[in-house]
């Protein structure tokens, strides 16, 4: 957007970044961070942009680690300031080892379609296999604008085609490390999708209630993840390695 990003590879830059976050947000009281665009988002880049020098070398050579050092800087500073609040950072990008900073990575601004929904299962499994257990997806997809016009009359909140996709994605989200509804083009508040006694509303409420009923299990699994290097989403071959049929199975876990 014409704004030069900071150099997160430099410890002094991370200090400055944290000072702004601490004074403007953390000291006011908050439960967790939502750090978007940690790729970083880069509009209309020129090839020469990637040759700019950072504290650790050219941006081209270290750019993939941008989310690691950015998220790590916030996590380290918060933990140095207080141990009374666990670090949780929702972020759009990841790098190997980032799990140690309490980060939860989502699949980004994906389209609202059945094909993209199908791909989320594979994405979650592959991501978990890298050693990063905390993963999630925008329920219903992010870009839902097509359901406001070309794929049916009216708005997405009134469009049966989006209703079905949103409900099924929400039901999948129940069994993900984090269940989180978010997106553009269509609001996601469940009260906009009907009322008690109506199928879409009731299905969304049932999914949310089921998620809450699983909290003891999720909390116990979180302990296993943290202390025994476990994971939430387990590809079938992790438990049935001797069965070749599980090796390329990306539709269940």
Feature roles, as predicted:
Residues 1-253:
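Catalytic-domain carbohydrate-binding cleft regions of carbohydrate-active enzymes
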């Amino acid at each position: 957007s014409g704004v030069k990003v900071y150099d997160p590879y430099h410890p002094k830059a991370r200090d400055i970044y944290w000072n702004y976050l601490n004074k403007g947000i953390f000291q006011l009281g908050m439960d967790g961070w939502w750090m978007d665009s940690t790729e970083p988002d880069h509009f209309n880049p020129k090839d020469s942009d990637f040759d700019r020098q950072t504290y650790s070398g050219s941006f081209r050579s270290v750019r993939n680690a941008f989310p690691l050092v950015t998220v790590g800087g916030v996590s380290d500073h918060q933990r140095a300031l207080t141990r009374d609040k666990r670090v949780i950072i929702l972020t759009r990008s990841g790098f190997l080892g980032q799990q140690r900073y309490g980060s939860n990575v989502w699949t980004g601004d994906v389209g609202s379609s059945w094909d993209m929904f199908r791909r989320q299962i594979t994405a979650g499994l592959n991501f978990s296999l890298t050693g990063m257990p905390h993963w999630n997806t925008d329920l219903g997809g992010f870009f839902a604008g097509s359901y406001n016009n070309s794929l049916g009359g009216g708005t997405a909140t009134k469009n049966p085609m989006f209703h079905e996709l949103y409900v099924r994605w929400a039901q999948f989200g129940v069994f993900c490390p984090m269940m989180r509804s978010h997106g553009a083009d269509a609001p996601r508040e469940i009260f906009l999708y009907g009322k008690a006694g109506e199928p879409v509303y009731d299905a969304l409420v049932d999914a949310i209630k089921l998620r809450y009923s699983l909290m003891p299990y999720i909390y116990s699994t979180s302990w296993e993840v943290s202390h025994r290097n476990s994971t939430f989403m387990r590809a079938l071959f992790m438990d049935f390695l001797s069965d070749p049929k599980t090796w390329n199975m990306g539709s269940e876990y």
